[in-house]
Amino acid sequence: MCIRDRFEYWAHEACFVPIEDYGLYRHRMLDPAAMGWKYSVKWMAEQGDAVASVLEHIRANGAARSADFERTDGKAGGWWSWKPEKRSLEVLFTSGVLMIAKRHQFQRYYDLAERILPGWHDGLLPPEDQVRRRLLLASVKALGLARAGWISDYFRTKQSRASLAHDLQALVDEGALLRCAVAGWSDAVYVHAEHGELLRAAAAGKLAPTLTTILSPFDPVVWDRRRALELFDFDYRLECYTPAEKRRYGYFTLPILRRGALVGRLDAKAHRAQGRFEIKSLALEEGVRVSPRLVQDVAGAVRRLALWHACPQVEIAQAQPAAFGALLAAALHDGGAAARQAA
């Protein structure tokens, strides 16, 4: 999607990106073969005529959806069973020939990049070292506190350890990054210079996180599973790809962030037609102490999530520990007073 201030592309993953950052991602479009499954050199070689036909259709008729092309391979559709025309649209998108003009009910409308971004030409392309610098600084700033091994994952940049170490040292030398130490860690961590005051406040024990919320599995807090484990001691995986009999927590578990700590996870389903939000399972992390404040914090977060799904009624099918589930159910069924207060 591209509307005034943002466009859609592969950044962290599929993301909405500020339009002023288009040049930072143009390098990827010019070398799409380096982007793994998102682009297929083989497809372009074997299906060149079909790809050209899809492109010509859009050039002549304007923005189009995958649904506007009749499936020609005779196969049944499916979530990941893309028809040839959809695959052609995607390789043209990844290579920057097409952009996403808009979305309607989750369907992408593809159009020519020159029609969506007429002011762009590759003479505006920033040098690669400048792109690398800007993405590195943006990564550290977004992460807050970053080990070197966490940085490249944020924007899926591909950089050798030696090259990254060189760039980090250069940014420290010029004062753009601060190098720090964390008790118990042998390696250095990096903080953006603009966060210097926050860093000093944190070191002095003057920062007190207050937010409690339910995270998406794709939230940057937990997206890098290694970082979530190292920083929060939170071992997380999305189990929708795990056979049902091997799942530990549920099909689509959502992490619970509470006052700066990941304290648990829940698997929920919104039954919107009945206005019912079902917590199929909920589990606190080992060592989390149950307290009235914890109960009210989590109840507030669950209530907000349920109401966002237009489900005023919340039910808890299973919780671990069970006593916490009972306390949470009571807090949720008090008319929402505690949850509204927490909000």
Residues of each region from the PLM?
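Long, charged, low-complexity, helical-prone intrinsically disordered regions
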Residues: 4-343
